[in-house]
């Protein structure tokens, strides 16, 4: 990962200065410095909005930034941190896409004022042992396939909340289980931040925007569209009841043999059991080669006529 040439400096009191300043964008790597900056902004009457990311930014992240920037009287912080604690030992941490300079350029284009880009040993210094337990939901769906993933995710999000102290934080709805767990953590731990879910940004053919789409070759990219098509089929089947929703989605997925489907599940919006009538969420996970893809959509389940 290429970093800007202006490295972190310190004043005579040992306080960390910004590591990078250009065109109105300031990049901080030190948590204490960023905390002081956001505290001063709140003291001056501004609100702080946060967009947590792992970098490799795309148009889905761009929409998160725009939503954050739309809050009147606010200053937006975008975090760029590939969090090792949410990757399993056989997962793609080492090859996860990293494009630091391009990420900064997108932040500048969207008028973001602050970027937080810490090093791993800053976030997890020697002796760090604390983690957030996601509870039973953390072992279901994505958690069943990726043990420890949600504990690592919640831990870093909790740290980002403590460092940035945002008034509002924005997360994409594509990672619906992540969003549900973050909302539950905020509720259970009385964290004073408003969590906003932003609808999934899609390609023109329906594929959900994702940093991991970069792993797909041209053939896989075409095959991946079956996931969003399956979600659409499930939505149309909502008026026939919950079982029909799942069956319709599975039928579409079965038409694409390259997809190794992990799960197709209909749940309540907070990921409890699926309702027989009302709002629900259809969630799909599948692999194309070595790439794991997830997506979800709202479904309105109604009574059979």
Q: What do the predicted segments below correspond to?
A:
Residues 28, 273-274, 281-305:
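Short, basic/aromatic-enriched C-terminal tail that caps enzymatic domains
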Residues 3, 8-259, 266-267, 290, ...:
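Nucleotidyltransferase catalytic core that binds NTPs
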Residues 260-275, 284:
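A conserved acidic, glycine/proline-rich C-terminal tail/linker
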